[in-house]
């Protein structure tokens, strides 16, 4: 979806929205850290996020890779910067074609900084001289597909500022006229360069309106994180620093925490003044850090740390090809990125109902599904590379996770227990102690308010429902006992399968069971998660593979722990268990005498 359309929707609803900017890190570790941070920040619901192109066009390939992952794995509406620096038109078209094929619809068109080693911008052979040329090219070749954003400079472009007094009236006027040319050529949104004098920004907005620029103008807010970085950035951008800011920073400039605290306070006050004028969109330059940006938003009341709203139980996709998707099998609830990667390229995505899962084919398992960020890999190494001498040791690892003693699991891309799991964590601990090793679960919910902090989704005003669900590994002996006990509980349905495909079930092979649904004003029933027998047989390969590629691999070759884990992998069954009585049922009753 185009960012301009999202901004217009928010304006029509009277909502204030915000967005974040990131830049490509220089190291693989930095990239892993960025995506972990981005996942946390995106949970707060930014309107979009953008990724920079890099000084002198130095990060072109990395920017394309990051933009793709942001749009399709992080599931946030993504705007990619695109500059003219070192970019002949063929390269520009390659970049645009790539992001279009990846479902990205938003571009920030810039001239770009001078190439490395040069003081002034140099037009590359076969390339463009300015952002206006780039905007014209995008509109001419790609029509209305892309939403195009351009940069606005409240104090004029740095190249137009020749003295410490700022741009001359003529230079400022010329810069505004050029901005209007970019908008007239097809840009539909303006994001400003950083500023610290709010009055300068508000004057800039008014001046734009006076010359006929009518599109939204979004203020770019850069929190002050450290004193030296602040001086470097404002010097590079030739940004005016009000005397009161200089006076406030001088006595604390060597105290980094005090500078950050002041930066949050200053950013908050700037945003309050801007919002008071009726502007409803804020863009935060994060510098790949989260605390200051989130601190400002919390101070403004735009986010709450303890209350993160969800439009669905899983983060909805933003890729233009799958934006209507609203139904998924529950099996990948803790591995959403793996699910996305295995369903890329489907011609259609389920909307309204799951339908026939045998129609689209899931992608084959690859190393991608088992790679993990360095930080998560390190945490798994610390928490799960504990010697395994018996099956009881395995049970203890799973119990510790359910008790919150561990914050990672080989079967989850998420951090720790999810809020709804904590409702049933005592029962989960008990069945894990008995050898039913849980990897996915949800409690029964009967008409809980949709804004509940533990089980809510879909926004305020609705009610949500869930059938109790468990997914676990267990031995054949335990499975036989459970199947026998379940005969006394007619509301229980199950599917069980081992690594080799031997299976047991009390439901048809093509059965689809909605296990989560919501009722909202003026809408049809929404049922975002299902138990689908056919998809479970696809998921089981991935679930069993994690025993070796997610856990056993943490131990050295030849380690006895690997042997025990291998035996469990080859002999245990994966079980999906649903209690269809979400009003009076008790999913855990069948386990009590086992």
Swiss-Prot record:
Known EC number: 1.5.1.54
Q: Which cofactor does it need?
A: FAD
Q: Which Pfam families match?
A: MTHFR, MTHFR_C
Which amino acids does the record list as binding FAD? 52-53, 81, 111-113, 153, 157-160, 175, 182
Task: Report the activity regulation comment.
Answer: Plant MTHFRs strongly prefer NADH over NADPH. Not inhibited by methionine or S-adenosylmethionine.
Catalyzed reaction equations: (6S)-5-methyl-5,6,7,8-tetrahydrofolate + NAD(+) = (6R)-5,10-methylene-5,6,7,8-tetrahydrofolate + NADH + H(+)
Single GO molecular-function term?
A: FAD binding
Query: Active-site residues?
Result: 21 (proton donor/acceptor)
The alphabetized list of GO BP terms reads: methionine biosynthetic process; tetrahydrofolate interconversion
Pathway as given in its UniProt record: One-carbon metabolism; tetrahydrofolate interconversion
Residue positions binding substrate: 113, 193, 285
Keyword flag Secreted: no
| Origin: domain of life | Eukaryota
Q: Key word NAD present in the record?
A: yes
Going by the UniProt record, its keywords in alphabetical order are: FAD, Flavoprotein, NAD, Oxidoreductase
Q: What CDD domains would the database entry show?
A: MTHFR
Q: What InterPro entries is this protein classified in? A: FAD-linked_oxidoreductase-like, Fadh2_euk, Mehydrof_redctse-like, MTHFR_C
Binding-site positions, NAD(+) = 21-26, 52-53
What the protein does comes down to:
The probable reversibility of the MTHFR reaction in plants suggests that they can metabolize the methyl group of 5,10-methylenetetrahydrofolate to serine, sugars and starch.
Q: Which family does it belong to?
A: Belongs to the methylenetetrahydrofolate reductase family.
Relate the assembly described in the record: Homodimer.
Provide the protein name. Answer: Probable methylenetetrahydrofolate reductase (NADH)
Q: Give the taxonomic lineage as stored in the record.
A: Eukaryota, Viridiplantae, Streptophyta, Embryophyta, Tracheophyta
């Amino acid at each position: 979806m185009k960012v301009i359309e999202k901004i217009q929707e928010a304006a029509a609803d009277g909502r204030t929205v915000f967005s974040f900017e990131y830049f490509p890190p220089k190291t693989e570790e930095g990239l892993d850290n960025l995506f972990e941070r981005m996942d946390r920040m995106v949970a707060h619901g930014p309107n979009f996020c953008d990724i920079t192109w890099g000084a002198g066009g130095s990060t072109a390939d990395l920017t394309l890779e990051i933009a793709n992952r942001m749009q399709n794995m992080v599931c946030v509406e993504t705007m990619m910067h695109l500059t003219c620096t070192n970019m002949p038109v063929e390269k520009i078209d390659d970049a645009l074609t790539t992001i279009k094929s990846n479902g990205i619809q938003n571009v920030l068109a810039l001239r770009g900084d001078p190439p490395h080693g040069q003081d002034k911008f140099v037009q590359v052979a076969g390339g463009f001289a300015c952002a206006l040329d780039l905007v014209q090219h995008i509109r001419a070749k790609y029509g209305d597909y892309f939403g195009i954003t351009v940069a606005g400079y409240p104090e004029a472009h740095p190249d137009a500022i020749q003295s410490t007094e700022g741009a001359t009236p003529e230079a400022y006027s010329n810069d505004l006229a050029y901005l209007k040319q970019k908008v007239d050529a097809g840009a539909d949104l303006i994001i400003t360069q950083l500023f610290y004098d709010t009055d300068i920004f508000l004057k800039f907005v008014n001046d734009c309106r006076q010359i006929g620029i009518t599109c939204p103008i979004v203020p770019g807010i850069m929190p002050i994180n450290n004193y030296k970085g602040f001086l470097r950035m404002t010097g590079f951008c030739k940004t005016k620093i009000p005397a009161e800011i200089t006076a406030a920073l001088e006595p604390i400039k060597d105290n980094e925490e005090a500078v950050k605290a002041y930066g949050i306070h200053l950013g908050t006050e700037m945003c309050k003044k801007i919002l008071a004028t009726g502007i409803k969109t804020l863009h935060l330059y994060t510098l790949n850090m989260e605390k200051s940006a989130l601190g400002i938003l919390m101070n403004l009341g735009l986010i709450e740390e303890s209350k993160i709203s969800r439009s669905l139980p899983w983060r909805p996709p933003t890729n233009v090809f799958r934006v209507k998707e609203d139904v998924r099998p529950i099996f990948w609830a803790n591995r959403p990125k793996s699910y996305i990667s295995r369903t890329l390229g489907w011609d259609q995505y389920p909307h309204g109902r799951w339908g026939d899962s045998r129609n689209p084919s899931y992608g084959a398992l690859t190393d991608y599904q088992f790679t993990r960020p360095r930080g998560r890999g390190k945490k798994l190494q610390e928490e799960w590379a504990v010697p395994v001498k018996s099956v009881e040791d395995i049970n203890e690892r799973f119990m510790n996770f359910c008790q919150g003693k561990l914050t990672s699991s080989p079967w989850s891309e998420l951090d720790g227990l999810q809020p709804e799991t904590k409702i049933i964590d005592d029962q989960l601990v008990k069945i894990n102690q008995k050898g039913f090793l849980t990897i996915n679960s949800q409690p029964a919910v009967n008409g809980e308010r949709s804004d509940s902090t533990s089980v809510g989704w879909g926004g305020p005003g609705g009610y949500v429902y869930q059938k109790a669900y468990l997914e676990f590994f267990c031995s054949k002996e335990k499975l036989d006992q459970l199947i026998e006990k379940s005969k006394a509980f007619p509301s229980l349905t199950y599917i069980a399968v081992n690594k080799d495909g031997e299976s047991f079930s009390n439901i048809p092979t093509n059965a689809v069971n909605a296990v989560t649904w919501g009722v909202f004003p003026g809408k049809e029933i929404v049922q975002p998660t299902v138990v689908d027998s056919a998809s479970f047989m696809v998921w089981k390969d991935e679930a069993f593979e994690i025993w070796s590629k997610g856990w056993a691999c943490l131990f050295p070759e030849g380690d006895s722990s690997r042997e025990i884990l291998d035996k469990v992998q080859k002999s245990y069954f994966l079980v999906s268990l649903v209690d269809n009585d979400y009003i009076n049922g008790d999913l855990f009753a069948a386990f009590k005498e086992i």
